[in-house]
Amino acid sequence: MHPLAETLLDEPVIAAVKTDEALTAALASPCSTIFLLASTLLTVDGLVHRIHDAGKLAVVHIDLVDGLSSREIAVDSLNALCHPDGIISTRPTLIRRARHRGLLTVQRAFILDSLLSLIHI
């Protein structure tokens, strides 16, 4: 089992951060895993290193890294740049590539309740 998966089973609370202030708070918290939900190609390496330096696992939402494309090569680029423990994405092609690279993956999905929209018509 992937080390991140084992950690999530033991500690199911995950910090999800978008700002530097939230990252600082998450680094000081007992959470062992941090989901990075906002970054740029210029900042993601430093943010992941801060998380790793604190002894925590870093999972990067690759769709929200400004400056990366939505092509499969983006997974390889991100992995070479900052070595995250895993990625989050809504794109199945990126999820498959990340799995083949040994990264833990979280596929984000949006679910719409179509029955609810019919009630309001």
PLM regions and their residue ranges:
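Short, Asp-centered acidic motifs that coordinate Mg2+ and/or phosphate
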Residues: T33, G86, L104
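General beta-strand structural signal in soluble alpha/beta enzymes
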Residues: A15, V60, I87-T90, Q107
